[in-house]
Regions:
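FabD-like malonyl-/acyl-CoA
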Residues: 1-142, 187, 191, 267-296, ...
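Alpha/beta catalytic cores of group-transfer enzymes, especially the acyltransferase/condensing modules
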Residues: 10-12, 103-249
Length: 309
């Protein structure tokens, strides 16, 4: 049986994520402690209690990475010889998680990199009142045309199933709501985001992030990664630096990535908080997706692997 690993991005976070892992597994407790030491913040409080910190990209991103890393390690322990996916695919931030878990970036460095990525995004969007908005029920072509006619709004994520995420100035996004309803939008939902990702607002941080990747990454990949920006497979440092930097200002083409690689695998494992990618995959793939964001999902994945691998 062939399988792929999926890693969620910003927007999948919620209070309590990773808690069942922390309560049941010594490894998870140790990783929470290491993460707290690396970031100099109590990650248990940040993830398990109501607080403002989890709304800041500088902490949201390492928090999401932490839960993905734990899910991967717990599942990896249960597989004879370790996980050997055909490929890994992350949604936005999740691509950084995928690169790390392929072996190119160790745990502490990845925590600091995701923290810096989120912080740079916040700085790039400072004083812009930026946000992101999900539009359901309007075609990609119609939204691309609308964005071309609209100042400070861009298509940021093509998630498939007539779901597109727009990024830009909050007031400009809000002003589009009546037009979107006229165009047939079933739902328009603002995301809990303090930044506008995958758009020109992030151009000021591209070079700095590229430098950070050059310093942090190793040229060591155990499995290939699918690029969000170009839908190409890569497994070396040079390409990772190029494509993770490019991704900042280019839309996430999740739909294309799943559809063009669907026939290569029999099942997808979503590693990390929530089941956002499982939901998207229902519209994109005829293959099952198992979400490993808590102990129940972990048990389901282990049972599946024991039966078929």
């Amino acid at each position: 049986m062939q399988y792929a690993l999926l890693f969620p991005g910003q927007g999948s976070q919620c209070i309590g994520m990773g808690k069942s892992f922390h309560e049941s597994h010594t490894l998870a407790k140790e990783l929470f402690e290491r993460a707290s030491n690396a970031l100099k913040v109590d990650m248990k409080k940040t993830l398990f209690e109501e607080n403002e910190l989890l709304k800041e990209s500088a902490y949201t991103q390492p928090a999401i990475y932490l839960v993905s890393y734990i899910a991967y390690q717990l599942l990896n322990k249960q597989v004879n010889g370790g996980l050997k996916p055909v490929f890994a695919l992350g949604h936005s931030l999740g691509e950084v998680s995928a690169v790390s878990l392929s072996g190119a970036l160790n745990f502490e460095k990845a925590l600091k990199l995701t923290h810096q990525r989120g912080k740079m995004m916040q700085e790039a969007c400072l004083n812009k009142d930026a946000s992101m908005m999900v539009v359901l029920g309007v075609s990609e072509e119609s939204l691309l045309s609308l964005c071309q006619r609209t100042k400070n709004v861009w298509c940021a994520n093509f998630n498939g199933g007539m779901q597109v995420v727009l990024a830009g100035i909050k007031d400009d996004l809000k002003a589009l709501e009546p037009t979107l309803k006229e165009m047939g939008a079933k739902r328009v939902v603002f995301l809990e985001m303090s930044v506008a990702s995958h758009c020109p607002f992030l151009e000021p941080m591209v070079f700095k992030f590229q430098e950070l990747l050059e310093k942090s990454l190793k040229d060591k990949f155990h499995f290939e990664i699918i690029s969000n920006a170009t839908n190409e497979a890569y497994h070396n440092k040079a390409k990772a630096v190029e494509l993770l930097s490019l991704q900042l200002t280019q839309p996430v083409r999740y739909q294309d990535c799943v559809k063009s690689n669907n026939d290569r695998v029999d099942v997808f494992f979503e590693l990390g908080c929530g089941s956002v990618l499982k939901g998207l995959n229902k519209r994109l793939s005829n293959k099952p997706t198992i979400s490993v964001g808590d102990n129940k999902g972990l048990d389901e994945a282990i049972e599946f692997l024991e039966e078929y691998v």
